[in-house]
Amino acid sequence: MYKLQFLSCIALTLALVANSAPTLSSTKDTKKQLEPLLLDLQFLLKEVNNYENLKLSRMLTFKFYMPKKATELKHLQCLMEELKPLEEVLNLAQSKNSHLTNIKDSMNNINLTVSELKGSETGFTCEYDDETVTVVEFLNKWITFCQSIYSTLT
C-alpha cells in the first residue's frame, strides 16, 4: 500500500521536474538574475529623471506598451519587445552626453538578462494594454514587476 503512494510521489516529482517546475536552486538563480535587471532598470530611470526639462518633455512624448497583466517571468517577452524603442528614445536624448556608453551597457545587460530569465519559450505572445505609457511610467512599471517577482521568490 505504501509502495503505491511512494511510486505516485516519485512520478509526481519527475513530472514536475520534467515540466520545469521551479526548484530551490533555480529560485536562487532567478533571484541572482533579477537583481542586476532591477539595478539596470533603476539606473535607466535615474538617467531619464536627470535630463534637462526640455529633453525630458521630448522623451515623454514617446509612448510605450505595457502588457495587460504582467505576473510571470514569461511576461518579460513584452519588455524585450519594447527594448529597441526604449533604446532609441534614450539615444535621442543622450546624443551629446557621455553617459551613452553606460546606457548602452545597461540596455545590453537588460537584453541578456531578460533572454535568460524568460527562457526559450517562443510561443508566448504579449497581450498589450490599450493605453500607452511614458518612458518614466514604463520603467517604473517594469521595476515594480521585478520587485514583485523577487519578493515571491523569497
UniProtKB/Swiss-Prot annotation:
UniProt-listed Gene3D superfamilies: 1.20.1250.10
Biological process terms in GO annotation: adaptive immune response
Coiled coil residues, start to end: none
Disulfide cross-links: 78-126
Signal peptide: 1-20
Family according to the record: Belongs to the IL-2 family.
Protein name (Swiss-Prot/TrEMBL): Interleukin-2
Organism of origin: Camelus bactrianus (Bactrian camel)
Gene it is expressed from: IL2
